[in-house]
């Protein structure tokens, strides 16, 4: 825990909760009559409102992207390596906005929050929201903050999908799009992994059809299994081999079916347990479905080039060589479509052994490329 914050940290930060009374029409045909969005901001908005950067989070992310909530906080925000003075998203230059998306479980309206119409927890009654719905809610957030146009919209993985959707839904409101370790839509294999994780959650006897909070229980076992499955896909075989190999946790093999004998088993159980204590099961189902549903080209005859013909932003795409969940080939699909649509695009494939989670890590070549692009953005 820091007693003095590093010079390149944004330091102590406080979340804000913004309430919206205007109904939000959703892709599903349902609507939210009112909702809350929790945000954090770093840096200062300039007089012309031209230096604003939106951070879009991935599946388990939230608004706390940088800095510390208290001097007792053990770890900084989830993208602290990239946000702060002198970092790729330099808060001396940019005004940075990070939020917890609708359907999340970190303060924004979602399954774990109170339904104002009933006075009870939403649970399974919270409507499905999509990437497009998130972008519409983020546009309202921009309006509330007095931001007509983002200097950049930035995100990795599911966050990259939101950044891409911004350029399609609101082309005139985005000058630069940074889409990192992402894809134009999920592959069948990716959807399959998400379905296995959902079934693990749904099969927990304490899930209770999504109304577990009313009964004062948590479907920890199912959520733990779901996270264990997901976490494997975020790491590369090389990274897991280097970190764990076949190292034993015990002194020797016990030759039974129940012992935790390998370090990798212990690690996965720890990750699953930790996740199950802080994340909402209904939110997990919603987030994985939002991933599955994302397919902006579907509305344009599955033609990604035609989908991107109307975008006005300049693009930066980055991928990682050992990411098999969102492989470099998926980023190149977007790059090729942008080139065919005659748009400005930069692309870097970074040699990194960490797999999909590399976009969250302080890899020198990644940070250098990230900084190089952000430094060229005029405000």
Swiss-Prot record:
Q: Which residues bind substrate?
A: 227, 357
Question: Keywords on this record?
Answer: Acyltransferase, Amino-acid biosynthesis, Cytoplasm, Methionine biosynthesis, Transferase
Pathway in which the depicted protein is active: Amino-acid biosynthesis; L-methionine biosynthesis via de novo pathway; O-succinyl-L-homoserine from L-homoserine: step 1/1
What is one GO cellular-component annotation here? cytoplasm
Summarize subunit and interaction data from the UniProt record for this chain.
Answer: Homodimer.
Domain AB hydrolase-1 residue range list:
51-360
What Enzyme Commission number(s) appear in the record? 2.3.1.46
Entry's SUPFAM superfamilies? alpha/beta-Hydrolases
Identification of the protein by name: Homoserine O-succinyltransferase
Q: Where is the active site?
A: 157, 323, 356
The family assignment reads: Belongs to the AB hydrolase superfamily. MetX family.
Q: Which organism is it from?
A: Pseudomonas aeruginosa (strain LESB58)
Q: What is its main location?
A: cytoplasm
Q: Which PANTHER family match?
A: HOMOSERINE O-ACETYLTRANSFERASE
Which reaction does this chain catalyze?
A: L-homoserine + succinyl-CoA = O-succinyl-L-homoserine + CoA
Functional note: Transfers a succinyl group from succinyl-CoA to L-homoserine, forming succinyl-L-homoserine.
Q: Which GO terms describe its molecular function?
A: homoserine O-acetyltransferase activity; homoserine O-succinyltransferase activity
Q: Where is this site: Important for acyl-CoA specificity?
A: 325
Q: Which GO terms describe its biological process?
A: homoserine metabolic process; methionine biosynthetic process
Q: Where in the cell is it found?
A: Cytoplasm
Lineage from the top down?
A: Bacteria, Pseudomonadati, Pseudomonadota, Gammaproteobacteria, Pseudomonadales
Record's Gene3D superfamilies?
1.10.1740.110, alpha/beta hydrolase
